[in-house]
């Protein structure tokens, strides 16, 4: 096959014999000194045994993470050198240990530069930032009654609509449990007596008119008429008893 290649090359060109074929040597004698300057070095090269033959690997590939990987590379290079004669440079241990820094080491160095918190606790003190006066297990002391009166924030704010107000009284009546007794004036009493003399029962419309005229509420007008009717019934009952005959018995 080689003779056919040479013959075809010589016959195709007129001066074929003048061209000299470049000898690249045997496969066993391949090394760095056979590489030309214009040739790009391969980044990954493997032979039939699976050993990496590339000379331009990165530092992370040249230097292993442990002694086990370094010993493996040295053993593999020695075995391949004995079998094929190719020289493989072993990584420099000083370069691996000094120049390369793992990400974990850099993170540790960066963490060491972080400033510590200003509040440091000694061994005898509690590490929790809880006030010593009020331990975690005990409840905070409740303010006393005198303190409630002095502190406006702790006092319950009372709005005007929370208080009861009487129309006849000026100001507020406070928070008494019982309603104060309504004191009617002579004019109010006279007008109510006149109305009761004509009508002992009031309609809703008439009650509203009287309440507006006398400056009273509907409830006050209603209560006054109820009391006035009870008094009128009591007076009529006493009159009926006094008018009855002295025998008081049934007469056929």
Swiss-Prot record:
Motif (Antp-type hexapeptide): 158-163
GO CC entries: nucleus
UniProt organism field: Heterodontus francisci
Keywords attached to this entry: Developmental protein, DNA-binding, Homeobox, Nucleus, Transcription, Transcription regulation
Family of this protein: Belongs to the Antp homeobox family.
Protein name per UniProt: Homeobox protein Hox-D5
Stored CDD domains: homeodomain (cd00086)
GO molecular function: DNA-binding transcription factor activity, RNA polymerase II-specific; RNA polymerase II cis-regulatory region sequence-specific DNA binding
Function (record text): Sequence-specific transcription factor which is part of a developmental regulatory system that provides cells with specific positional identities on the anterior-posterior axis.
Feature: DNA-binding region: 177-236
